Structure formats: structure tokens, C-alpha cells
Amino acid sequence: MSSCGACTCGAAAARLLTTSLTSAQRGISCGRIHVPVLGRLGTLDTQILRRAPLRTFSETPAYFASKDGTNKDGSGDGNKKSVTEGSSKKSGSGNSGKGGNQLRCPKCGDLCTHVETFVSSTRFVKCEKCHHFFVVLSEADSKKSIIKEPESAAEAVKLAFQQKPPPPPKKIYNYLDKYVVGQSFAKKVLSVAVYNHYKRIYNNIPANLRQQAEVEKQTSLTPRELEIRRREDEYRFTKLLQIAGISPHGNALGASMQQQGSQQMPQEKRGGEVLDSPHDDIKLEKSNILLLGPTGSGKTLLAQTLAKCLDVPFAICDCTTLTQAGYVGEDIESVIAKLLQDANYNVEKAQQGIVFLDEVDKIGSVPGIHQLRDVGGEGVQQGLLKLLEGTIVNVPEKNSRKLRGETVQVDTTNILFVASGAFNGLDRIISRRKNEKYLGFGTPSNLGKGRRAAAAADLANRSGESNTHQDIEEKDRLLRHVEARDLIEFGMIPEFVGRLPVVVPLHSLDEKTLVQILTEPRNAVIPQYQALFSMDKCELNVTEDALKAIARLALERKTGARGLRSIMEKLLLEPMFEVPNSDIVCVEVDKEVVEGKKEPGYIRAPSKESSEEDYDSGVEEDGWPRQADAANS
């Protein structure tokens, strides 16, 4: 009898195991099975073992249905309505409302209801008939899940090989010359830095992946359709495990699970392999750049012009809006978010980009308030330290909600950072360090420390009468001797200065350079105003003496090239008011007009006798616009 009982229990266990395996292959399900057990001595009893219903989860894409009941893929569905994209946000309980907005079970065709959770826009629905749970996905989400998969190292190699060969530094320099006048040293530094950035991206790729990419490029292999399918299956499987509360990493809650890449990264040499290796591959490190110079000297224009001629993503970020983590303002991660946006949210491409940090001097720390938190100064510098050196930054994903916390990991190791700032008063700090008098008499010897004290001293010196040319030459001479300790005294922390090894001082603009800026480069100031007047069929003539007078006025204002536009707007205000819809065909500006001794000269078209109807504002005669009251002139 014991053998019979053992045999019976073994058969029951086998049936139970077979049923469990079958259920596991079909998904997590519930049901009832008959298990024979031993009752009283010598009798065989059969009891019904009930299991608590387990939730069954499935994942199905939502297809759009037309009015005639035909799905997007062309298959008819009879009277059953397909799941629409907008229906995942509405309640699907009951039969009221439009039939197209109701969710139906893919297995039995019965109506599904939404699962109430703390998230208002839940995607979980439940079939009341077969008690199955489903995750509603649209076609866009299905495609997005494939794109979400992290690209492998081979993809980065292919991206590097798909790009055009890097332009030589001389070609970049000549391109910058067309838009930026002067600053030859800064243009050389930026041209060489960009060229070396291209070479560093190529060199830091492992040799085996580089050879593989070259072979694939030459043989032009077939598309990665099988790989995409495999990634899709893997993503769906891990997604279902998360929903069911089973994590591949052993986490019972299944809260955070990093997506696994399709290919493994090449293993680096570790431990004894490094000791036994006769040679190591050279890994090129980046050299971040710091541009410093007076306002209006062309720092931002250099960055904007450089961004047009590059094949790598380029982002210009304003440091004045950055704050320390946890405070109101833009987070430091927004710097990489702008670069990722310029790369069209391609992570591998963004990791090879260039970031231009403008107005970096505005985040200098202010001495004397160490007992308080400098959230817009020293706190931002501390947050930028690892970003400049190279770290993995979690950037919020495109169109992601803060509640979900979806982020994209971006490695900043190969991202080149170029910082720029005016650093007003830095020349006075250098002069004090060198124990030199600054432009003669009256220089205080007990200057305070920090950027505020330096800027205040520089502003006080501007109020006095001094030779503008001598002032410019003295500042340029002192800025050429800038050292790291001068920047530290200005308010930059030593760790931040050490991560910007290349310091490039920009010289101030003299009168000759300002005259060239007015006329020579592409998109110059004078051609812009000539184009404005040409739209009203009028010419603008500015004499050489007038150009020199405008340059001298800009030098006196000490605002660099930005002062040129302010002066031109003031000079041409009356002509721009008089010319539209008039018989003025030419405006002449000479030296006396710039000095304010007379008004601009006008050349008018010869008047012709016409009827009153021809003086309409929309009528043009002989190519010249005419006003309604032109006869009075």
C-alpha cells in the first residue's frame, strides 16, 4: 500500500509539474487541478486543490481602426473595435460613449477596464471575463522601445566612420576669418582644438572594433533586421517580468532594471593582464579651453561661427542661469541636455560633441560669504567639476515626465568643453601680482579680493579720463601674462581652473579692427543696414571718415564691437523713419553726421506730374515708392 501511495503521489507530482511548466510557457495564469492524495488508511481520495488566481499580464500593441472596422494592417476585425491610442487615457468601463474608444480583450473580445493606480495616466487594463491584465501600447511606443536600447560600441565606431574626414586646422581658420575679424591667436587655438577632437574620437576607439567597422564599411553588410527583432523580443520579455514583479537581477519589487545592450563591450585588461602586458594603448585625453577677453571682442561670435562648420553636435550654454542642485534655476545637467537635443537625441553622437560655456566668469565665487551657500557661484563650479573631467550624466529623456523619472545616460569623457568670459578686472589682479602701477597715479594698493572687487575697481578706473589706446594696450599686455592663481583670486576654485588647461586671452579691438568689422566680414554691420534700405528702394552710403568716427565712438564706450550697432541705430533713426514710402533714393552719412554737426543727406527722385489717384501708397512709378503727400515736397 505504501508503494501504491508513493506511486500515486509521484504521478500527481508529475501532473502538477507538467501543468505548471505548460502554464509558465503560456504566461502566468490561474486555474484548478485535481490532485489525488491519500486519505484514510487503505483508501484513495481525490480532492480539488484551489489556487488563488494569479494575475496574467500580456503586452499588446494598439492598432488604429477605421470606421469600417478595418485595421491599419489591412485585416478586418468584424464588429470588434481596435484599441486606439487616445483610449489609454480614458475610462473604458461600460458600453457608453463611442465604440472606437473602448478597449477590447485580444483573447475573448470582451470589454476591458482600466486599473486604478496612483498614476492618473495608467496603461494597465483588465478583462472582466477572462481576468487577464494587459499593457496598452501604441505603435509609436513599440518603435520607441527599440530605439531606447543602448547602442553598442560598434555603433559608435560606425558613427565615427560615417562622418566626413575632419577638416584641417588651416581650413577651419580660413572659414573663421570670413566672419570674425582679428583674434588670430584664438582662431588658431580653436581650429587646432577641433581638429584634435576629431582625432581623439577616432583614436580612443578599440582597435578590434575599428577593424570590424572598416571591414563592415568595405563589404557593406546586410541591414540589422534580425538584431532589431532580437532586441524587441528581449525588451518585451524583461518588461513583462517587471510588470509581474519579477526582476532579472533578483529584486522582488522589480523597480529599476537597466536595459542590457545587445553586444558586450570589450573587456579591458585588468589585474595580472596589465602587469604582464608589454605595452598599453595610448588613450588621448581632452584639453578643455578657457577664452578670456573684454566684452565685445568676439568670443561668442567665434563659437557661433564654429558651430556652423562642424559635423559634431555643438551646444552653446549660458552659465548665468545655472544653479546648484536643489535650487530654483537650470540644473547643471541641462548643459548636456542641450547637446543631446542638438544631436537629435542620439546618445552616441552627443558623446562626441563640443559644449561652449558662455559667461563662465559670472559663476565666480564671492569671498567673505563662506558661511552662506553660494548656489549660483561656487556651487555651480563644484557641480561642473566631474562634468568637465568625464562622468556619466543622467539627462531627462525627451518628453518624459518627472513622475516616471526616465533618464538617458550620457558619458562626458569625450566631450570637449570651451569656456569663455569677460573677467572684468582680471588685468588689475595681474598688475597687483606683478607689483606694477596701473596707468599712472591713484592706483589703490589695498584692493579687495574676488570678482566683485576687481569689477568695481575696473569700473572706477573707467569713470576717470584716460587715454583709450594706452588703456587697451596695457590691458592686452597684462592679460597675456595671466596665470592660474590670478583666476583663483578672481573667484574661480582651483579644481575648476585645473580642468581648463588651455587659457587663451583675446585682445581688445582697436580703431582699425572696428572699421574692418563694419564692412569686411560676411554679415557685417554696414551691409545689413544697406539691405534694410534696399527693401525700400533706397541706397545707403557711408564715407571712410564716417566709419573711422564710428569706430572712435565705439572705443570710447568700451563695449567692443557691440557698440557699433548701438551707434548705427542712433545715426540712422531719422533716415529709417523718413525713407519708407517716400521719394528718397539715397541716404549719405559722413563724418559731420556722426559727430552730430548736421543731419544725414537725402537724394530724392525727380518728381513727375501725376493725378491724385497715382499717389496711393500701393502705386509705384519708375520703380520708386511714392507717398500720398509727396507733392508737398
Swiss-Prot record:
The modification N6-acetyllysine is found at residue 437. The modification Phosphoserine is found at residue 617. GO terms for cellular component: endopeptidase Clp complex; mitochondrial endopeptidase Clp complex; mitochondrial matrix; mitochondrial nucleoid; mitochondrion. One of its GO terms (molecular function) is ATP hydrolysis activity. It is an enzyme of class 3 (hydrolase). Residues 93-146 form the ClpX-type ZB domain. Residues 1-56 form a transit peptide. Keywords: Acetylation, ATP-binding, Chaperone, Hydrolase, Metal-binding, Mitochondrion, Mitochondrion nucleoid, Nucleotide-binding, Phosphoprotein, Transit peptide, Zinc. One of its GO terms (biological process) is ATP metabolic process. It comes from the Eukaryota. Its EC number is 3.6.4.10. It is found in: Mitochondrion; Mitochondrion matrix, Mitochondrion nucleoid. Residues 69-83, 598-610 have a biased composition (Basic and acidic residues). Residues 65-101, 598-633 are annotated as: Disordered. It catalyses: ATP + H2O = ADP + phosphate + H(+). Residues 611-622 have a biased composition (Acidic residues). Residues 84-93 have a biased composition (Low complexity). ATP binds at residues 294-301. Coiled coil: none annotated. Zn(2+) binds at residues 105, 108, 127, 130. ATP-dependent chaperone that functions as an unfoldase. As part of the ClpXP protease complex, it recognizes specific protein substrates, unfolds them using energy derived from ATP hydrolysis, and then translocates them to the proteolytic subunit (CLPP) of the ClpXP complex for degradation. Thanks to its chaperone activity, it also functions in the incorporation of the pyridoxal phosphate cofactor into 5-aminolevulinate synthase, thereby activating 5-aminolevulinate (ALA) synthesis, the first step in heme biosynthesis. Belongs to the ClpX chaperone family. Homohexamer that forms a ring structure; this hexamerization requires ATP binding. Component of the ClpXP complex formed by the assembly of two CLPP heptameric rings with two CLPX hexameric rings, giving rise to a symmetrical structure with two central CLPP rings flanked by a CLPX ring at either end of the complex. Interacts with TFAM. PANTHER family: ATP-DEPENDENT CLP PROTEASE ATP-BINDING SUBUNIT CLPX-LIKE, MITOCHONDRIAL, ATP-DEPENDENT CLP PROTEASE ATP-BINDING SUBUNIT CLPX-LIKE, MITOCHONDRIAL-RELATED. This is ATP-dependent clpX-like chaperone, mitochondrial. It comes from Rattus norvegicus. The lineage of its organism: Eukaryota, Metazoa, Chordata, Craniata, Vertebrata.
